[in-house]
């Protein structure tokens, strides 16, 4: 997801790290951001209209485009432009309508199928409140309306990491099970 919105993501490995002669520096800290700060960098959004990228992607043959990951868990879908690029409280990233249309155009151009995961963070709900589809509805509806429906979905990425992934504070495995079930009931009912 960070490739689409831009943002902090993993640095490319150095040749020395690949060769095993340079260590990966994991910092000390209370949270994952502090621990991995030296292994990450800020990236601009990728240009999904780049002809070379599209040509190379087409050469793969039948493919799935997965727009997911830990960053998806914390992304707000600002399809009506109300945020003006400012991240709402409880989220970490903003996806604009133009960025999502870029994904849909890319998927269409290369003849791929689309798989996503959805927001499940403090901006959407607290741990003691059930997940609700307010954000998911935006992205599923726009995709369907645009003619590139979402073919596959996972509720969230890396549920084994709970709060480090971006889930609400105090979120438990039981909360995840509850919310994943709610997501799939909603999905089957509205976007079978």
Where are the regions that the model predicts?
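Non-catalytic accessory regions flanking glycosidase/transglycosidase catalytic cores in CAZymes
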Residues: 1-155, 160-192
